[in-house]
Amino acid sequence: MSKKILVVDNELRSRQLIAHLLREENYEVDEADDGATALEILEKKNFDLMICDVVMPRLSAFDVIDHMKSRSLSTSIILITGHSYLVAENGLESLPCFKKPFNMYDLLHKVKEILVK
């Protein structure tokens, strides 16, 4: 059974590129264009990993993560952002974080590393 990944990014091109790369590796991928939509999807389906942009309309990655913690969801998380200082300011420096623009194959390597655990 393939691993399930949720890709959350309000930047359409970035989201589609990440999703395409993951599908090429035979992962099952869902997409959300903002944090609120991500929460709706997370309520309906379990994921092995969420790749989430930090700054988005409606709800940020921090809001999504807070909700996931309150619901005891055990989904692994990778953050992507153009504002890496926000990750440290919100106490999430223990999470893997890729600063935009980043190498897609570095991201793919991290995905594989997380999902084999």
Residue ranges and their predicted role:
Residues 56:
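Receiver (REC) domain active-site loop signature in two-component systems and cognate sites
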Residues 53:
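Active-site residues of response regulator receiver
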Residues 78-82:
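Hydrophobic/aromatic residues positioned on beta-strands within the core alpha/beta folds
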